[in-house]
Curated annotation (Swiss-Prot):
Keyword Cytoplasm: yes
Catalytic activity: 7-aminomethyl-7-carbaguanosine(34) in tRNA + S-adenosyl-L-methionine = epoxyqueuosine(34) in tRNA + adenine + L-methionine + 2 H(+)
Lineage of origin: Bacteria, Bacillati, Bacillota, Bacilli, Lactobacillales
Quaternary structure (record): Monomer.
Entry-linked HAMAP family: QueA
Species of origin: Streptococcus pneumoniae serotype 19F (strain G54)
Protein name: S-adenosylmethionine:tRNA ribosyltransferase-isomerase
Matching NCBIfam families: PRK00147.1, queA
Length: 342
C-alpha cells in the first residue's frame, strides 16, 4: 500500500483552531465497521455505546509546557528550545532554534534566570542534548516559564492551557495531548463508571513525531518514532478480568491503542503489566490483539493515524466516514470532533 492511498481533500476552514466551550459538546460520528452504518451524534452519546463490564482505557499523560524562550548568556542572542524527552536526570533532548549557533558548552538563560541550560551534545536535524540547572522542582519551574507546544496547524493562541490537557492528565511527559481524551468531562466519566464500565488508565508520552508527515511512498519503508509507555499491574489485571468475563476493551485514542497493541504483540495476545519504548506501526493487514473498539479524533491526510484507523475498519470505510464528516462540517484534528468505531 502507498501513502497516497490515505489522502483526502480537507477544506482548511474545518481545521479546529480553538476548543469548544463545553468539552463533550463536540460531535461524534459512530461507525459500525461490520455494516458500514454511520450515525451523527454528540460526544456525550458515547455512553450509549458502552456496556456494563466493558473497560474504557485512557492515556493519563500530561503535556509539558515544553517550549522555552531564552537568551545566550555570552551574546544575549535569542534561543527557542522545544523539549522532546528526558534522557537522564536533568539532561533533555531538545529541538533548538537557531541550532547552528548552539555549540557544545553554550549557556542559555530563561526568564529571570531561575532556569539555565548548557548544551552538552549536538545531534542531527537541529537536535541538542542540554543539561538544565535550576532552584526547586524542575516541573514547577517549567510550568511557570514554558509555553504549550500547540500543533503546527493551530494558529490561534490558547487562552486556557488546561484546555490542551485531559481532565485526568497526571503523568507529565508529553509534547502533545492525547486529543481523543479532550472530549471527556469529569461528570461524563462518573456517569460511565456508574453504568458499570471500568475506567482504566495507562501512560504513553506523546512525542512530536506524531505530527511528522510520512515522507516515503511505500508504507513498508516508513520508520515510526519511539514513545515511552507504561501499564500498571492493577490496570493489566482489570483488563484481563474484563476479557475473561466477555467485556470489551475500548481504547480512547491512538496512543492508548498503540500501548495496548504493543503489549498484546509482545506477550502473544496476553495483557501484562509492562513499560518501555514502542515504535509500533499499525497499518492495514495488522492482526489486532487487544482492542475491540475505540474513539479517536479526525486525523491528517496521509498520516500514520489514518492508517491505524484503516487497519481496524478498512481503508474504504474510513475514507467514506471522513468524506461524510467533511460534508457534515465536522471539525478536524486536535481541537476537533471525534469518531467511535466498533
Amino acid at each position: 500500500m502507498n501513502t497516497a492511498d490515505f489522502d483526502f481533500h480537507l477544506p482548511e476552514e474545518l481545521i479546529a483552531q480553538t476548543p469548544l466551550e463545553k468539552r463533550d459538546a463536540s460531535k461524534l460520528l459512530i461507525v459500525n465497521r461490520e455494516t458500514g452504518e454511520m450515525q451523527d451524534k454528540h460526544f456525550h452519546s458515547i455512553i450509549d455505546m458502552l456496556e456494563p463490564g466493558d473497560a474504557l482505557v485512557m492515556n493519563d499523560t500530561r503535556v509539558l509546557p515544553a517550549r522555552l524562550y531564552g537568551q545566550k548568556v555570552e551574546t544575549g542572542g535569542h534561543v527557542e528550545l522545544l523539549l522532546l524527552k528526558n534522557t537522564s536526570g536533568d539532561x533533555w533532548e531538545v529541538l533548538a532554534k537557531p541550532a547552528k549557533r548552539l555549540k557544545v558548552g553554550t549557556r542559555i538563560s530563561f526568564g529571570d534566570g531561575r532556569l539555565s541550560a548548557v548544551v552538552t551534545e549536538e545531534l542531527t536535524h537541529g537536535g541538542r542534548i542540554v543539561r538544565f540547572e535550576y532552584q526547586g522542582i524542575f516541573l514547577e519551574v517549567l510550568e511557570s516559564l514554558g509555553e504549550m507546544p500547540l500543533p503546527p496547524y493551530i494558529h490561534e493562541k490558547l487562552d486556557d492551557r488546561e484546555r490542551y490537557q485531559t481532565v485526568y492528565a497526571k503523568e507529565s511527559g508529553s509534547a502533545a495531548a492525547p486529543t481523543a481524551g479532550l472530549h471527556f468531562t469529569k461528570e461524563l466519566l462518573a456517569e460511565i463508571q456508574a453504568k458499570g464500565v471500568h475506567l482504566v488508565y495507562l501512560t504513553l508520552h506523546v512525542g512530536l513525531g506524531t505530527f511528522r508527515p510520512v515522507s516515503v511512498d511505500n508504507l513498508d519503508e516508513h520508520e515510526m518514532h519511539s514513545e515511552f509507555y507504561q501499564l500498571s499491574e492493577e490496570a493489566a489485571a482489570t483488563l484481563r478480568s474484563v476479557k475473561e468475563n466477555g467485556g470489551r476493551v475500548i481504547a480512547v485514542g491512538t496512543t492508548s491503542i498503540r500501548t495496548l497493541e504493543t503489549i498484546g504483540s509482545k506477550f502473544d495476545g496476553q495483557i501484562q503489566a509492562d513499560s518501555g519504548w514502542t515504535n509500533i506501526f499499525i497499518k492495514p493487514g495488522y492482526e489486532w490483539k487487544v482492542v475491540d473498539a475505540f474513539s479517536t479524533n479526525f486525523h491528517l491526510p496521509k498520516s500514520t493515524l489514518v492508517m491505524l484507523v484503516s487497519a481496524f475498519a478498512g481503508r474504504e470505510l474510513v475514507l467514506d466516514a471522513y468524506h461524510h464528516a467533511i460534508q457534515e462540517h465536522y471539525r478536524f484534528f486536535s481541537f476537533g470532533d471525534a469518531m467511535f468505531i466498533y
